Amino acid sequence: MGYYAFERLIPVVHPTAFVHPSAVLIGDVIVGAGVYIGPLASLRGDYGRLIVQAGANIQDGCIMHGYCDTDTIVGENGHIGHGAILHGCVIGRDALVGMNSVIMDGAVIGEESIVAAMSFVKAGFSGEKRQLLMGTPARAVRSVSDDELRWKHLNTKEYQDLVGRCHVALHETQPLRQMEENRPRLQGTTDVAPKR
């Protein structure tokens, strides 16, 4: 695992969290209960404190960083999509940040909000509860619908369930040379489907 102390500060990871072995956690990082940290995520707490609250997920290739005397926070059940960058910002409870989005210093994403994939949220942005944000720079285009929030909850639950599945069934191995006959397919734990 990539855990590094920095100036006597050691990352704190709740025993029920899952941190992929290729992820890197440096210094002042606090990871809560049931959190999922994906492959190649970088949580660099060498300036400001990084807090990932209970039930949140930080997916593959995400970056968290911030400035001194500030906290970068992902609230409870927050959902941070692949490749997103969070820098000195606050992501509200139950919010989703889409793939490859960038959230800058001092920005606050409101509870139950969704930031569309590939969006750029400017420094100092102050969002409200349940906004759909999109664009570069991102702006609020409408409220998040009940169906969208339900879809978000199902996706977040898949990652919360993945924590336990990874603790039990994920291990390093060697690849097969060819696909076996009748190879099974993996199943999720909810009926969530891709958004179209």
Curated annotation (Swiss-Prot):
Residues 176-196 are annotated as: Disordered. It comes from the Bacteria. Pathway: Amine and polyamine metabolism; carnitine metabolism. GO terms for molecular function: transferase activity. InterPro entries: CaiE, Hexapep, Transf_Hexapept/Carb_Anhydrase, Trimer_LpxA-like_sf. The keyword Transferase applies. GO terms for biological process: carnitine metabolic process. Pfam families: Hexapep (PF00132). Keywords: Repeat, Transferase. HAMAP family: CaiE (MF_01525). Belongs to the transferase hexapeptide repeat family. NCBIfam families: PRK13627.1. Overproduction of CaiE stimulates the activity of CaiB and CaiD. This is Carnitine operon protein CaiE. It comes from Escherichia fergusonii (strain ATCC 35469 / DSM 13698 / CCUG 18766 / IAM 14443 / JCM 21226 / LMG 7866 / NBRC 102419 / NCTC 12128 / CDC 0568-73).
